[in-house]
Amino acid sequence: MKIDENLPNYLTIARIAAIPVIILTFYINSPLARMLGALLFVLASITDFFDGYIARKYNLVTSFGKMLDPIADKLLVGCVIIMLLKKSDVDEIPCLLILAREFLVSGLREFLALVKVSVPVSTLAKTKTFLQMFALSILVLGSKGSNIIYLDLVGEIILWIAAFLTIITGYSYFKACKKYF
């Protein structure tokens, strides 16, 4: 089967392109819009798995993709967190922990790239990303887009777990930079 050599990059770009549509659906006061926004967020989140999987499996890894993929993840998660903070009752603490870690780690990754140190993505970091995206999917849908009474609470609990893992996984980047302090 022939795969377009840019497919992983197209998936990453699609993840970024989905952000304004997800935000728009959140501002439409309709359960259907909330369901559509949550579905679109889930699909955008799934591209995070497939872009990397396809790139590695078919040897389509590019410097552009390696640079853009983590940016797309942070944009998707960050924009949705900011949207939720502005328009819902989501707890600020796990959201701010996640945002702070993502900004710090982005800076540390840039520094580590300058000194030619690579920090591989751990299984725990992949679990963290999955839980962040799962929690945010639930919170985007929320009780306004579903008849499930405790859906917001479930989303918040998962978000707290993701925030805890966010701090733990961020430590590996600080550890890699320690000898440069």
From Swiss-Prot:
| Compartments, record wording | Cell membrane
PROSITE patterns to which the protein is assigned, alphabetical: CDP_ALCOHOL_P_TRANSF
The membrane spanning regions, by residue number, are: 8-28, 35-55, 64-84, 148-168
InterPro entries per UniProt:
CDP-alcohol_PTase-I, CDP-OH_P_trans, CDP-OH_PTrfase_TM_dom, CDP_ALCOHOL_P_TRANSF_CS, Phosphatidylglycerol_P_synth
Give the UniProt record's GO annotations in the biological process aspect.
phosphatidylglycerol biosynthetic process
E.C. number(s) listed in UniProt? 2.7.8.5
Which reaction does this chain catalyze? a CDP-1,2-diacyl-sn-glycerol + sn-glycerol 3-phosphate = a 1,2-diacyl-sn-glycero-3-phospho-(1'-sn-glycero-3'-phosphate) + CMP + H(+)
A single GO molecular-function term is: CDP-diacylglycerol-glycerol-3-phosphate 3-phosphatidyltransferase activity
**Keywords of this protein's UniProt record, alphabetized?**
Cell membrane, Lipid biosynthesis, Lipid metabolism, Membrane, Phospholipid biosynthesis, Phospholipid metabolism, Transferase, Transmembrane, Transmembrane helix
Enzyme class, spelled out:
transferase
Taken from the UniProt entry, a GO cellular component term is:
plasma membrane
Q: In which pathway does it act?
A: Phospholipid metabolism; phosphatidylglycerol biosynthesis; phosphatidylglycerol from CDP-diacylglycerol: step 1/2
**What is the protein's membrane topology class?**
Multi-pass membrane protein
What function does the entry list?
This protein catalyzes the committed step to the synthesis of the acidic phospholipids.
Family, according to the entry, reads as follows: Belongs to the CDP-alcohol phosphatidyltransferase class-I family.
Protein name per the record: CDP-diacylglycerol--glycerol-3-phosphate 3-phosphatidyltransferase
Originating organism: Rickettsia bellii (strain RML369-C)
